[in-house]
């Protein structure tokens, strides 16, 4: 079949279709479909199907779905902020100009110039916002190993000259100390040079062993910082350092608080014999409460007479 015959058959079919609808449209009108020859309802459906919401400005404005606000127009390339625009303010670090530039201090010049993050001289040096506990505690790594990986930037104390505590505030060292006189860490390592043993008022004790008030402590601070076996020095009552210490001058009042301190937590469940306290103190070696011997920390006591059970007393009376 020739192409001309196919064209003539199609043309005849188009005339039949136009006669059925009552119109006299040509074949060009059948193939060239435009918006004028299509009903408005069909046009809206075709437009909604062929329109994409992700395309650019070529597709025109599309109404939003029912119940949604209209979309804001996308800014053009001239309205978008550029990341390299001069109006962008650079964020400064909290440590900006808080340390001296090492290169400038050694050679007197710096390759970064005014853009350097470190201070070029004392005039540009700023005061850093430190933590309230900055340089108020000992560095454990420097104390145990003799060195610290952080060096001068460590927030803990390495040397006595680094103590930056305010003069109006008491210096608090949170260094746990055992009753044998050595820190609770490694007992073989000596303290750093320049530090004598921490005093009792500046040490934090464990909750199970509450220290007596400062006015009632009869022992010197060196009693807890001495090695085991060293005789304990007794504080002279005449050399009192505060009014609360001058009120206790007799030996009975001096050694009175030790009577309550020498008892272990299980003393109330035992008898009143001093030997019972000594035996209970030796059995509770792992407890935190200190148990002192009467011959070392107090005046010698007379041995108590042997006690007998009440039933034996009744038997001896009846006989």
Curated annotation (Swiss-Prot):
Residues 95-186 are annotated as: Necessary for interaction with PABPN1. Keywords: Cytoplasm, Developmental protein, DNA-binding, Exosome, Metal-binding, mRNA transport, Nucleus, Phosphoprotein, Repeat, Ribonucleoprotein, Transport, Ubl conjugation, Zinc, Zinc-finger. The lineage of its organism: Eukaryota, Metazoa, Chordata, Craniata, Vertebrata. It holds the Pfam family zf-CCCH. It is found in: Nucleus; Cytoplasm; Cytoplasmic granule; Cytoplasm, P-body. Expressed in skeletal muscle satellite cells. Strongly expressed in differentiated adipocytes compared to preadipocytes (at protein level). Expressed in embryonic stem cells (ESCs). Expressed in heart, placenta, kidney, intestine, liver, lung, thymus, fat and spleen. The modification Phosphothreonine is found at residues 84, 250. The C3H1-type zinc finger domains are necessary for ARE-binding activity. Induction: Up-regulated during adipocyte differentiation. Up-regulated transiently in response to fibroblast growth factor FGF4 in a MAPK-dependent manner in embryonic stem cells (ESCs). Up-regulated by interferons and/or lipopolysaccharide (LPS) in a STAT1- and p38 MAPK-dependent manner. Down-regulated in muscle satellite cells upon muscle injury (at protein level). Up-regulated by various mitogens. Up-regulated by LPS and TNF-alpha. Up-regulated by interferon IFN-gamma and/or LPS in a STAT1- and p38 MAPK-dependent manner. Up-regulated in keratinocytes during epidermal repair after wound healing. The keyword Ubl conjugation applies. It comes from the Eukaryota. Associates with cytoplasmic CCR4-NOT and PAN2-PAN3 deadenylase complexes to trigger ARE-containing mRNA deadenylation and decay processes. Part of a mRNA decay activation complex at least composed of poly(A)-specific exoribonucleases CNOT6, EXOSC2 and XRN1 and mRNA-decapping enzymes DCP1A and DCP2. Associates with the RNA exosome complex. A zinc finger (C3H1-type) spans 95-123, 133-161. Residues 65-84 have a biased composition (Pro residues). GO terms for cellular component: cytoplasm; cytoplasmic stress granule; cytosol; nucleus; P-body; ribonucleoprotein complex. Residues 1-166, 92-319 are annotated as: Necessary for localization of ARE-containing mRNAs to processing bodies (PBs). P-P-P-P-G repeats lie at residues 63-67, 190-194, 211-215. Residues 89-165 are annotated as: Necessary for RNA-binding. Zinc-finger RNA-binding protein that destabilizes numerous cytoplasmic AU-rich element (ARE)-containing mRNA transcripts by promoting their poly(A) tail removal or deadenylation, and hence provide a mechanism for attenuating protein synthesis. Acts as an 3'-untranslated region (UTR) ARE mRNA-binding adapter protein to communicate signaling events to the mRNA decay machinery. Recruits deadenylase CNOT7 (and probably the CCR4-NOT complex) via association with CNOT1, and hence promotes ARE-mediated mRNA deadenylation. GO terms for biological process: 3'-UTR-mediated mRNA destabilization; 3'-UTR-mediated mRNA stabilization; cellular response to epidermal growth factor stimulus; cellular response to fibroblast growth factor stimulus; cellular response to glucocorticoid stimulus; cellular response to granulocyte macrophage colony-stimulating factor stimulus; cellular response to lipopolysaccharide; cellular response to tumor necrosis factor. This is mRNA decay activator protein ZFP36. Residues 1-92 are annotated as: Necessary and sufficient for the association with mRNA decay enzymes and mRNA decay activation. The modification Phosphoserine is found at residues 52, 58, 80, 82, 85, 178, 189, 210, 220, 269, 289, 316.
């Amino acid at each position: 079949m020739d192409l001309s015959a196919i064209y003539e058959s199609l043309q005849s079919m188009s005339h039949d279709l136009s006669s059925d609808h009552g119109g006299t449209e040509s074949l060009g009108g059948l193939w060239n479909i435009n918006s004028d020859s299509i009903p408005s309802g069909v046009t809206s459906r075709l437009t909604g199907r062929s329109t994409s919401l992700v395309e650019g400005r070529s597709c025109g404005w599309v109404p939003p779905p029912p119940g949604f606000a209209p979309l804001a127009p996308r800014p053009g390339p001239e309205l978008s902020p550029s990341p390299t625009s001069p109006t962008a303010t650079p964020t400064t670090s909290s440590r900006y100009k808080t340390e001296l530039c090492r290169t400038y201090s050694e050679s007197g010049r710096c390759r970064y110039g005014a853009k350097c993050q470190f201070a070029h001289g004392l005039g540009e040096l700023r005061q850093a916002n430190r933590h309230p506990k900055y340089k108020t505690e000992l560095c454990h790594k420097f104390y145990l190993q003799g060195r610290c990986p952080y060096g001068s930037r460590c927030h803990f104390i390495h040397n006595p000259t680094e103590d930056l505590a305010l003069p109006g505030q008491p210096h608090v060292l949170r260094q746990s100390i055992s009753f044998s006189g050595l820190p609770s860490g490694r007992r073989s390592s000596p303290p750093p040079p320049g530090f004598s043993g921490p005093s009792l008022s500046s040490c934090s004790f464990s909750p199970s062993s509450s220290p007596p008030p400062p006015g009632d402590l009869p022992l010197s601070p060196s009693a807890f910082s001495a090695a085991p076996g060293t005789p304990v020095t007794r504080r002279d009552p005449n050399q009192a350092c505060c009014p609360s210490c001058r009120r206790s001058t007799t030996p009975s009042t001096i050694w009175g608080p030790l009577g309550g301190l020498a008892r272990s937590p299980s003393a109330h469940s035992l008898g009143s014999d001093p030997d019972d306290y000594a035996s209970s103190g030796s059995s509770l070696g792992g407890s935190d409460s200190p148990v002192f011997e009467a011959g070392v920390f107090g005046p010698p006591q007379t041995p108590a007479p042997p006690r007998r059970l009440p039933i034996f007393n009744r038997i001896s009376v009846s006989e």
